[in-house]
UniProtKB/Swiss-Prot annotation:
This is Repetitive organellar protein. Residues 1-42, 54-116 are annotated as: Disordered. It is found in: Host cell membrane. Possible candidate for an effective malaria vaccine as determined by epitope response in sera. Keywords: Coiled coil, Host cell membrane, Host membrane, Membrane, Merozoite. InterPro entries: VID_Regulator.
Length: 1979
């Protein structure tokens, strides 16, 4: 979008060029017309005056004067032009004064016109007297005119010649240089634009890549959303299940109701029985018993109710406590989250690019948190369901009690009726009852007891019906049977007793009367109990209703929370997509804002520079004014002198005229006198001219000054308008607030103003007088200066006019040529840029169409999802209609939310009031002239007010004294007023003191409250967000009712406030000025107290407030029928659907608006750039035009000024003086005003920006921190759980491994037994072998004598010998010798037979050796498994410790974070500085403490990475003896460390391994003298064949202490360098001396790790080649980008490199390990090589690291540069791999490879992969236990002649091939070590140092065998190598002698110690009796 700017720029340049050309053409035409007019004037003069031929004597003098005048005029014009150019701010670089020719001609014309006019005037006055003189003058004029014409013609000719010469001789060099400079400038701009285009393209590529990543992440989010929807479906299914359960509960209730009906029927039967029984005599006694029992049951029920109430209260308290605990935990979590977020701000500053990824992760975490909340809500719902069951149980109990109570009342009524009937019957049967009394009492009491027991059972059943539901049927059946039996018995008894009752009636009549009295009493008591019981039941019902309401509230809250969470989920899904759209817009906005900020900074700089320039100009103007004032004084003096001279001359003229009248006849004789007079007239004309010029100059200065002032005024007006527009609203508010105060202050300050006016009037009068005096003096000086200047500057004007004409013509021509060339260049560029721009626009449009389609598709998917969710929610609403009676209580919740909203509004109002009163204080300070900027804190303002009050106490006393003086005359009338005033004043002083103290004490409280207000504001914001959600669900009608009530409260509060304000105003009017301030302070204090009370109330628990509100609300008004609720819910559903449809339409509109706004923003930015360029161009054009216009105006004004008279000068001087005064005053005012405005503007800008930045940044940071801390806490908890699981798994694995270990030990013991048996057989074979070897040596000596005769014949049979084995070669050669040596010697046959016997015997020995090797391999396998298990145990223990340390560290950080959060609000700025300091330290420690694999490194390890020194001198010779301590010293200096084992755990008896610690130090080897001596074998000279026994005298190395184990450690930083194959490190690695290598112990893990890394590089090389071949048509940069992308995301290896390897090597996975050994091509693929994750090997490029450090703008350049560097490094790596392989080849040179004994072959194996199964088959020669047998003994030396013959045989061999034997030995050592690999790589390389004293016994046997087997082969392969024969033979003899001496004398003790091998597979110090397991400080 940037290219639109360029095309328009060039079009505008072309248009401006055309305009400039047209303007110049018009000006040329005007100049030509003016010239023609001037020429016509001269021609007329010549025609009229050409006839006069008389000459005047003074023609020459006149000519000279004229020339001088012309020169002066030219000089003056030059000076004027220079002054004009300086005033125009140096903008005339290419355009000069184009109209100078016209000026010159006009000046000449004007001069001559004036001259002719003056002459004509003199002639008119002197027609009669001076006719002769006029004739002479006419002659002189004509002659002068002719000369002038001639001069002009000559001048024109000369000008033409000059033009021709200049055209020829123009300096082409200057012109070309200028053109080149401009071309270079244009090229630079073009290059800059191209660079910008490239940067834009690069950014577009980066943006596209990021969009791809974002799209991928969105897909992942969509998948997770699907999972979330599935969870929601499951939740709905569970709701369905819940509904089914509820239906079952309803069915159970129905069954219970049926049972209750049955119970009622049975109760009715019982009641019938009771009626029959009550009809008998003892009914009264039964009633008494019933009453007592019922009282007891009531008491028991009351007790139960009380207990349950206590339980409910306890539950309430527990709920409250749990809520408090939850709040505390939430606060703590928030505080912790805040602190952790602050710690993460440092990382976020370095990871701006990852912010978008983190946002998406946060959204995912929020989803997870929401799911957790949903789960918690489900749990709470389960609890609530349980409580519902309990409440239902209690309700059933209460219902049963009510029913029983009603029944009892009915029974009482029946009893009363029956009593009345019985009275009549009892009177009859009293007599009968008396007789039967004794018999019937016992029976009746039994029946009564049975009935009471049944009633108790029924009550108990009603209480515990749920527990006994299953047993009800059985009990009921039993009860029915019992009742039937009882009824039968009762009927029989009734029949018997009816007869007896008749007798008892009479007896009981008397008793009935007494009983009736008692019954009345009991009825009263019963009624009392009844009323109390009813009241208690009502209270219980009320409490139950309250609990039900609370329960419904809780249930509604949970349902609302669920709905909220669902809405939040949908909102988050929408926010994710909106965030993705906003990300792209924000990126563009960031770039645009950065550009705008830069522009604004530049504009600020320009404005500051302009302001400084204006200040300088103002100072210059002041200086110029002073200078002009001085000039005016001088000119006034000159004018006075001229006037005096003119008066004198006039007097003289009068005298002369009188003389001329008298002497007219003598005039012709007195010509000389007349000439003097004419001369005087000429001087006067000159003076007039000078005066006119000075006047013109003064006017020009005045006009320029006016223009500058006008510009300044315009600038000031513009700024004032801007400030007024910004501050209009604020000013209007302040006006309304402060009008009352201003009126009061006016009344206070009227006296002061009057006094000041009087003082100012006096001063003004004095200043006026002084100023008038100065003006008069200035006038006089000005007139004098004008006269002097006119005389000086006449001649200069003419010369300057001529010079300017030449310059103008030359500049025109040059300018035209330049413009033509530039137009041609710009047209070509414009065409090219148009084409490019159109292509790019087409590309952008195509890309935008694709993006728009994607957005539309996404939106359609979202709409479908919303539809699905809506359908689901509709189903939910349909189901929830059944539970409408529960939802009726939602209204209460809505009311609570509204109350909370109103509380928030109230709090906001109080905060607004607080701010208003602070503003009032500030306004008072402004009125009192106290500084109160926004930066100043409230405390400082109050302190300044106190200081002001203290300073003004003296003034108050003075005012009081004056008032007492004024009122002294009215003491009689106003004595009472004085008394009241004194009392009021005393009270005011006391109140002031009190208020001052209160203010000081309350300042601190205000600060604390401000802090709390900030916290409350944050809470209020959160609550507002929640309120918006609740509002959608609330009913409008109820809200309106409550709003009205609250509006009434507000109106009342406002009325109260108004009343108070009216009272305050009345008090203010009554009191005096001094008391008004005190009243204001009081009011402020009162309202501050109110504010504090409000804050204190806000601190209280919201639960109490809610309870108070609930008490006020009528609960009965909230109960509404279920049908109404259903209708309203349906209406809400319809409204909700409409809102959703609206929201969809709004979404479409918003997306369209966002797209349109982005396009408009881009277009506006382009337009802005275009307008800026147009303004720049127009400014240049306008400047040129202004210059031309100014020049034209100046010239016109000069012409007009010449025609004016001297009389106007005086008037102008007066006007100028007045204007100067005005301007001085105006300038002073403008300067002060501008300074004030600038200061205010700057202060307000700074304050606003500071506040905005602080508030916005703090809010954003705090929100982001809170979210991050929540996520981190969850992540930490998950980590804890994972670690615990891992620990448990590790423990289980450890137990399994222990079991396996025990099994392996058993197997190992069995193998050891077998090994001992084999070793015994081996001893026997070795003894036989030695005997045979002695005989063989004798035969060899004989064979050597014969060999010299048959050397030539042996060469013919080389090919045959190659095909067969070593032993067969010996047999064949012997046979060939036998066949051809029969003639010479018969002894050869016997020798051959013996050799064949020896060969057969040796074959048996080799077979035994192979079995021994196989057994050793099995032993090594077992030992490897054991060592791996121990290492795993150690690693588990270390991990446990590490986890415990992390837990402790987290606890400490939590405590520290809590402390930090407390201090955050008060000391945020200090904490931020401390954090910046701590971040540096933490960064440094983090680098030192972290290794490659995340392990903690030791602080003692040095980290100097770039300082290298050579490790050894390259010219060290192996032949000279060197001391090992020197090598160690060099190693210590070059990043190596020597160590010593200082602790050994010798208690472990099961294995021969050391478990201990390393002690390491800087110069450990030198301090302890560990390496005492080392004598390298001295130089071996040429030894003759006769010196056989010299080999026995070879020097051996001195042994070390047996207990010392030296270890060589390489530092971690050096390992990293080795991994990246640093040149210097590789050189160090190669220069290590072999003697050091031989004593070095390298752990197998490190060797395996190095080989893995080398193979990784090989695979990467193959991968690059394959990718490059596949992408033939694309750039190599893109290919490299893919390779770099592999490094950056190592987790996606399967997509890149593994996929490549699997495609090529898929068939090789089926090949077994044995096939690998047979063929080199068949190799196995594994994945271990490629599993270098970011935690283990961070293969990040330099560019990626720089991106993390926010070098986004330079990313492309760094990528290109890093690409080249990585290619270079890659080539170096390849070359270094070759070096390593060459080293391996040198070691393997001339060695016969068996199976996998070659290092280069092992590299090839690793290069394709390493199979984990191969580890079972790999041997570990380092841990070989070759010396386990204890029965071996040393064999003594055998000094037999056979040995001598063998030595002679070896000495006579060809020395060319002896090096092969040494290389063979070395190669075997290397192969045995390199084949031992381990899966786990170790961070630190430990190189084990041990002594090399004696070789291994088995190896020496193998050497001898290989030596004898390969002698003929060596001779046959290299027949032509005969150089250095003697040296090699001696070397070979020496090696053989060493072997022989070892066999004879140094045979190892098999009861001795284990052997340890170095990298060359040589045995290191057999005196070491134990292997070692390294357990170092580094782990």
């Amino acid at each position: 979008m940037v290219f639109t700017f360029k095309n328009k720029k060039k079009k505008k340049e072309a248009s401006s060029d055309k305009v400039s050309k047209e303007s110049f053409n018009e000006e040329d035409n005007e100049n030509n017309e003016k010239r023609e007019k001037s020429d016509s004037w001269y021609k007329k003069i010549i025609e009229t005056k050409g006839k006069s031929k008389t000459k005047y004597k003074n023609d020459n003098s006149l000519d000279d004067n004229i020339n001088e005048d012309i020169i002066n005029n030219n000089n003056n014009n030059n000076n004027d032009n220079n002054n004009d150019n300086n005033n125009d701010n140096n903008n005339d670089n290419n355009n000069d004064n184009n109209n100078d020719n016209n000026n010159e001609n006009n000046n000449d014309n004007n001069n001559f016109n004036n001259y002719s006019d003056e002459i004509s005037k003199n002639i008119i006055h002197k027609d009669n007297e001076l006719e002769n003189q006029l004739k002479d003058t006419l002659k002189s004029i004509s002659s002068l005119s002719n000369k002038i014409v001639n001069y002009e013609s000559k001048i024109e000719e000369l000008e033409k010649e000059l033009k021709e010469v200049k055209d020829k001789n123009i300096d082409n060099n200057d012109y070309e240089n200028k053109l080149k400079e401009k071309e270079d400038f244009v090229k630079q701009k073009i290059d800059m634009l191209n660079e910008k285009e490239n940067l834009l393209q690069e950014k577009e590529l980066d943006i596209n890549k990021r969009e791809k990543k974002i799209n991928e992440k969105e897909k992942n989010i969509i998948k997770k959303e699907e999972t979330f929807h599935n969870i929601e479906k499951e939740y709905l299914e569970k709701n369905k299940e819940r509904e089914t359960i509820s239906i079952e509960i309803i069915d159970i209730k129905k069954h219970l109701e049926k049972l209750k009906i049955e119970i009622k029927e049975k109760k009715e039967d019982l009641e019938n029985l009771n009626k029959k029984l009550l009809s008998k005599e003892n009914v009264l006694k039964e009633l008494k018993g019933c009453v007592k029992e019922k009282n007891e049951t009531i008491n028991s029920l009351n007790d139960n109710i009380i207990e349950k109430e206590k339980k409910y209260k306890l539950l309430e308290y527990e709920l409250e406590e749990k809520n408090k605990q939850i709040d505390l935990l939430n606060k703590q979590e928030k505080e912790k989250e805040k602190e952790k977020e602050r710690e993460k701000e440092k990382e976020r500053e370095k990871e701006k690019e990852k912010e978008y990824d983190t946002l998406i992760k946060e959204l995912k975490d929020e989803k997870i948190s929401i799911l957790e909340k949903v789960h918690s809500i489900k749990v709470r719902e389960m609890d609530i369901e349980k409580r519902e069951h309990n409440f239902l149980h209690m309700e059933d109990q209460l219902k049963d009690l009510k029913n029983s109570f009603v029944k009892n009342n009915n029974q009482l009524k029946v009893y009363k009726c029956e009593i009345k009937n019985l009275k009549t019957e009892l009177e009859k049967k009293e007599k009968e009852l008396k007789d039967i009394e004794n018999v019937s009492k016992e029976e009746i009491n039994k029946l009564i007891n049975q009935l009471n027991e049944k009633e108790k059972q029924i009550l108990a059943f009603n209480k515990n019906h749920k527990e006994e539901i299953h047993g009800l049927k059985e009990e009921l059946k039993e009860s029915v049977k019992i009742t039937k039996i009882e009824t039968q018995e009762l009927q029989e008894m009734v029949d018997i007793k009816q007869k007896e009752l008749d007798q008892l009636q009479e007896k009981y009549n008397a008793q009935i009367e007494s009983i009736s009295i008692e019954l009345s009493k009991k009825e009263k008591e019963y009624n009392q109990y009844k009323n109390t019981y009813i009241e208690e039941i009502n209270n219980l019902n009320e409490k139950l209703e309250e609990t039900n309401k609370e329960y419904t509230n809780l249930q509604n809250n949970y349902t609302n929370e669920i709905n909220m969470l669902n809405n939040d989920i949908h909102m988050l899904n929408g926010n994710i997509k909106t965030m993705n759209t906003q990300i792209s817009t924000l990126k563009n906005d960031v770039h645009l804002l950065n550009e705008q900020i830069d522009k604004l900074n530049n504009e600020k700089g320009t404005l500051n520079s302009k302001i400084s320039e204006l200040n300088v100009q103002i100072m210059d103007l002041k200086e110029e004014k002073d200078f002009l004032n001085n000039q005016i004084v001088d000119l006034s003096n000159q004018i006075d002198l001229l006037t005096r001279k003119m008066e004198e001359k006039e007097n003289k003229m009068l005298e002369q005229e009188n003389k001329y009248k008298q002497e007219m006849e003598l005039l012709r004789g007195n010509i000389k006198s007349s000439e003097n007079i004419l001369n005087n007239d000429e001087e006067v004309c000159d003076l007039k001219r000078k005066l006119s010029l000075k006047e013109s100059e003064m006017k020009m200065m005045k006009e320029e000054h006016d223009k500058k002032l006008a510009e300044l005024k315009d600038d000031c007006d513009v700024r004032i308008r801007e400030m007024n527009e910004k501050n209009e609203d604020k000013i209007n508010m302040l006006k309304e607030e402060y009008e009352d105060k201003i009126n009061t202050l006016k009344e206070q300050n009227e006296d002061k103003i009057n006094t000041l006016k009087e003082q100012n009037e006096d001063k003004i009068n004095t200043l006026k007088e002084e100023y008038e005096h100065k003006i008069n003096t200035m006038k006089e000086e000005y007139e004098h200066k004008i006269n002097t200047l006119n005389e000086q500057n006449e001649h200069k004007i003419n010369t300057l006019n001529e010079q300017n004409e030449h310059k103008i013509n030359t500049m025109k021509e040059e300018y035209e040529d330049k413009m033509n060339t530039l137009n041609e260049q710009n047209e070509d560029k414009m065409n090219s840029l148009k084409e490019e721009y159109e292509n790019k626009i087409n590309q952008i449009n195509s890309n935008n169409e694709i993006k728009i389609k994607d957005v539309v598709n996404e939106y359609i998917e979202e709409v479908d999802k919303l539809k699905v969710t809506l359908d689901e929610k509709k189903k939910q609403f349909d189901k929830e209609i059944n539970y409408a009676h529960i939802k009726a209580h939602e209204k209460e919740q809505i009311l609570l939310t509204e109350m909370e909203e109103l509380k928030c509004q109230r709090d906001n109002k109080y905060s607004d009031l607080y701010e208003k009163y602070i503003k009032l204080i500030k306004s008072i300070c402004m009125i009192i002239n106290i500084e109160c900027c926004d930066d100043i804190e409230n405390e400082d303002i109050i302190r300044r007010i106190e200081e002001y009050i203290n300073n003004n106490k003296g003034l108050k006393k003075e005012v009081e004294e004056k008032e007492h003086k004024r009122h002294s005359s009215f003491n009689i009338l106003k004595s009472k007023e004085k008394f009241f005033k004194n009392s009021i004043e005393d009270k005011s002083h006391e109140l002031k003191k009190k208020h001052e103290k209160d203010l000081l004490s309350k300042d601190k409280e205000i600060e604390e409250k401000n802090k709390k207000i900030k916290e409350l504001n944050n809470d209020i914001k959160k609550l507002q967000d929640e309120i918006l959600v609740y509002k959608k669900q609330s009913n409008a009608q109820q809200v309106d009712h409550k709003k009205k009530s609250w509006i009434l409260l507000k109106d009342k509060s406002k009325e109260k406030i108004k009343d108070k304000e009216n009272q305050i105003n009345v008090e203010k009017n009554e009191e005096k000025d001094l008391k008004k301030k005190d009243d204001e302070i009081r009011i402020l204090n009162e309202e501050l107290v109110k504010y504090k009370t409000i804050l204190y109330n806000l601190k209280k628990d919201p639960l109490l407030q809610n309870q108070d509100l609930l008490s006020k609300i009528d609960i009965n008004s909230l109960t509404i029928n279920e049908g109404m609720c259903v209708d309203k819910i349906e209406e809400h559903i319809l409204d909700y659907d409409e809102e959703i449809n609206k929201s969809r339409s709004n979404l479409f509109q918003l997306k369209n608006e966002i797209c349109s706004l982005t396009t408009e923003v881009m277009e506006l930015n382009n337009k802005k750039n275009e307008l800026i360029e147009e303004n720049n161009k127009l400014n240049l054009v306008d400047q040129g035009k202004k210059k031309l216009k100014k020049d034209v105006e100046k010239q016109k004004k000069e012409i007009e000024k010449l025609n004016k008279q001297l009389t106007k000068c005086n008037k102008q001087i007066d006007e100028l003086n007045e204007e100067v005064e005005k301007l001085n005053n105006e300038n002073i005012e403008l300067i002060t005003y501008s300074n004030d405005l600038n200061n205010k503007f700057d202060m307000k800008e700074n304050n606003l920006m500071m506040k905005l930045d602080e508030n916005e940044d703090n809010i954003k940071k705090m929100k982001s921190k809170i979210d991050d801390m929540e996520k981190e806490i969850k992540y930490r908890e998950d980590e804890k759980k994972r670690n615990l699981n891992e620990i448990n798994n590790l423990k289980k694995k450890n137990e399994d491994m222990c079991i396996k270990y025990n099994e392996m030990n058993i197997k190992y013991g069995d193998i050891c037994v077998k090994y001992e048996e084999m070793s015994l057989t081996y001893k026997e074979t070795s003894l036989k072998y030695e005997q045979i070897k002695v005989k063989y040596d004798e035969k060899c000596s004989q064979y050597d004598e014969i060999r010299f005769q048959y050397d030539e014949k042996c060469f013919q049979y080389d090919e045959i010998n190659k095909k067969y084995g070593a032993l067969l070669n010996i047999n064949i050669t012997n046979k060939m010798v036998d066949s051809k040596v029969d003639r010479n010697n018969n002894e050869i046959i016997s020798v051959d037979n013996k050799v064949e016997g020896i060969a057969n015997y040796l074959k048996q020995i080799f077979e035994l050796n192979e079995e021994i090797i196989r057994l050793k391999g099995e032993i090594n396998k077992i030992s490897l498994l054991y060592s791996n298990e121990l290492n795993e145990k150690n690693s588990y223990d270390i991990n446990m410790k590490h986890i415990q340390e992390q837990l402790l560290f987290l606890e400490k950080t939590n405590k520290e974070n809590e402390e930090k959060i407390i201090n955050l609000t008060s000391q945020y700025s200090d904490a931020y500085k401390k954090k910046s300091d701590e971040s540096k330290l933490c960064g440094a420690q983090f680098v030192d403490d972290v290794n490659i694999y995340g392990n903690i490194s030791n602080n003692n390890i040095r980290t100097n990475e770039y300082k290298y020194e050579e490790m050894f001198d390259t010219n060290i010779e192996e032949k000279n003896g060197m001391h090992l301590s020197k090598y160690i010293h060099l190693l210590e200096e070059n990043k190596f460390r020597c160590m010593k084992i200082i602790y050994e755990n010798e208690n472990i008896k099961s294995s021969n391994k050391i478990i201990g610690l390393y002690n390491y130090s800087r110069y450990y080897g030198l301090r302890e003298d560990l390496c005492k001596e080392e004598i390298v074998p001295s130089k071996i000279g040429n030894i003759s064949n006769k010196n056989e026994n010299n080999n026995k005298k070879n020097n051996t190395c001195d042994g070390y202490d047996e207990k010392v184990t030296i270890v060589l450690c390489i530092i971690l930083n050096e390992i990293i360098k080795f991994l990246f194959l640093n040149d210097e490190y590789v050189l160090l690695f190669e220069k290590i001396h072999k003697n050091v290598w031989k004593r070095m112990y390298i752990p197998e893990e490190i060797k395996f790790f190095i080989l893995k890394y080398i193979t990784l590089l090989n695979n990467l090389r193959d991968y690059i080649i394959s990718v490059h071949n596949n992408m033939k048509n694309e750039k190599y940069d893109e290919c490299w980008f893919l390779f770099q992308h592999y490094f950056e995301r190592s987790s996606d290896v399967r997509k890149e490199m593994v996929h490549f390897l699997l495609e090529r090597k898929s068939q090789e996975n089926l090949i077994s390990f044995k096939s690998k050994l047979k063929s080199k091509k068949e190799k196995i693929l594994t994945m271990d090589i490629l599993n270098f994750s970011k935690e283990h090997m961070q293969l990040k490029t330099i560019a990626h690291l720089r991106k993390e450090i926010n070098y986004e703008k330079l990313s492309k350049d760094t990528l290109n540069r890093d690409y080249n560097l990585l290619l270079y490094k890659y080539q170096e790596c390849v070359s270094k791999l070759k070096r390593v392989k060459n080293l391996m080849k040198e070691i393997n040179q001339n060695v016969f490879i068996e199976k996998y004994d070659d290092i280069s072959k092992e590299l090839d194996n690793f290069s394709d992969g390493y199979n984990e199964q191969n580890e079972q088959h790999v041997m570990d020669p380092i841990l070989l236990n070759n010396n386990k047998n204890k029965n071996n003994k040393l064999i003594t030396e055998h000094n037999n002649p056979i040995i001598n013959r063998l030595t002679n045989f070896t000495q006579n061999r060809d020395s060319k091939y002896k090096n092969k034997i040494m290389d063979d030995v070395k190669q075997r050592k290397i192969n045995s070590t390199m084949n031992n690999t381990n899966k786990n790589g170790i961070n630190i390389i430990y190189n084990h140092y041990e002594n090399l004293n004696k070789p291994n016994y088995n190896d020496n046997i193998n050497r001898l065998n290989s030596y004898h087997q390969n002698i003929h082969i060596a001779n046959s392969i290299h027949p032509n190598r005969n150089q250095n024969k003697s040296f090699l033979t001696n070397q070979a003899n020496s090696t053989y002698s060493v072997m022989k001496n070892y066999i004879n004398s140094d045979k190892p003790n098999l009861n001795g110690k284990k052997s340890v091998r170095n990298i060359f597979n040589e045995i290191v110090d057999e005196n070491v009796n134990k292997t070692f397991v390294h357990k170092s400080v580094f782990f």
